[in-house]
A protein has these predicted regions:
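Hydrophobic h-region of N-terminal signal peptides that target proteins for export
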Residues: 10-19
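Extracytoplasmic
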Residues: 20-177
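Bacterial N-terminal signal peptides that target proteins for export
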Residues: 1-7
Length: 177
């Protein structure tokens, strides 16, 4: 009986992962449906994948002094699955290298805190097996980036159901299967 339950559970997990396998959803940060200060849209035509990005400027403030600030995104998932969240970011320094993020109504989580500064680069969540993966059902979802530290920039957001995929450069926005 226990073996049957285990095998059934393993089959369902594999089936769910297989349904979304290879799906990649990429969007530009400036497509946020809502931006609340101190998050600002920067359109300088130089940096960022499309010449624009979101930023919490250095010195703009962060919690607990400044509790406002967010960027809200909505996107469609074509098939249920387990996804890795990748963001193309630019960090000012060790005190400006993370966001708080929230997917749908799930608990908020820390995004970032790597040690690559003053360069555009990709960062992923979850980093380790200790963090819960992002299990997303087919349909509409909401992703919110909240003010945690100033001196941060966000250029692109990418969700991938392929655990082996690692973005290297600017990604083409849209859905790929």
């Amino acid at each position: 009986m226990n073996i049957r339950v285990f095998l059934t559970g393993a089959f369902l997990c594999a089936f769910t992962a297989a349904r979304a396998a290879g799906v990649k959803i990429c969007f530009e940060a400036e497509t946020a449906e809502k931006i609340e200060a101190p998050v600002v849209l920067v359109t300088n035509g130089i940096e960022g994948a499309s010449g624009a990005y979101l930023e919490i400027p250095e010195g703009a403030g962060n919690p607990p002094k400044v509790t406002d600030g967010k960027a809200v995104f909505s996107f469609e998932v074509p098939d249920e699955g387990v996804f890795t969240l990748w963001c193309r970011v630019w960090w000012d320094g060790e005190c400006g290298n993370s966001f708080t993020a929230r997917m749908d109504d799930l608990p908020a989580f820390l995004f970032g805190e790597d040690a690559t500064y003053k360069a555009w680069h990709w960062v992923k969540y979850p980093l380790a097996r200790t963090a819960a993966p992002l299990r997303l059902a087919k349909g509409r979802h909401s992703l919110v980036f909240l003010n945690r530290e100033d001196g941060v920039r966000l250029d692109q957001v990418l969700l991938s159901a392929d655990r082996r995929f690692v973005p290297v450069d600017i990604e083409v926005p849209g859905l790929r299967k």
